[in-house]
A protein has these predicted regions:
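Aromatic-rich, lipid-facing transmembrane alpha helices and their immediate juxtamembrane interface loops
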Residues: 2-10, 23-176
Length: 176
């Protein structure tokens, strides 16, 4: 059983005590146990690395989304940091998969639809359900319940194109 890129900087002497074979391929260390199970020393390391990376991506997406909203309308709401983090984390996860067979335009359209759906769900919960009135698109054309509109869906499409290339840059940053 081979494990993927989360095992990078594991020292040889710690793992060799647990009867592990090493197979080096570039900078990434692939680990295989004799019995095919995940090592009790290696598994927590993998989970810590995965959690740190996911938390960084989540916070990065949340703060970038919050900064964009502040630039666009002058203020933001803390729940928008949560929404931005969730959206970027899921987009980053999708971009980690083999996406070379799908065009960037198609991926951006799917991501824009996904972000619009999440914006609608958050709008129903926060604006209509809890009455926070964080945003209101009622005065814009082609809106749905005042929570989403076509104009912002197109804006999400453009920003999704930028996110695709930002995900590539982050992946390069993490692999260094």
């Amino acid at each position: 059983m081979f494990l993927n890129p989360y095992i990078k900087y594991v020292s040889k002497n710690v793992i060799s005590r647990k009867r592990i074979k090493f197979l080096y391929q570039g900078k990434i260390v692939f680990v295989r146990l004799y019995n095919g199970e995940v090592n009790s020393v290696v598994k927590p390391y993998i989970m810590r690395q995965f959690f740190k990376k996911s938390m960084f991506v989540f916070l990065f997406g949340g703060f970038v989304y919050g900064a964009l909203e502040i630039l666009w309308r002058g203020y933001t709401h803390p729940s928008m940091l949560l929404l931005g983090g969730i959206c970027f984390l899921i987009i980053y996860g999708c971009e980690q998969r083999q996406t070379k067979y799908i065009s960037p335009l198609s991926r951006a359209a799917v991501y824009a639809a996904f972000i619009t759906c999440l914006e609608f769900i958050f709008g129903l919960i926060l604006n209509i359900g809890l009455g926070l009135d964080i945003w209101d698109y009622s005065d814009l054309y082609f809106n749905l319940c005042g929570q989403i509109c076509l104009l912002f869906s197109l804006l999400w499409f453009v920003l999704s194109m930028l996110c695709i290339y930002l995900c590539k840059a982050l992946r390069f940053f993490f692999e260094k």
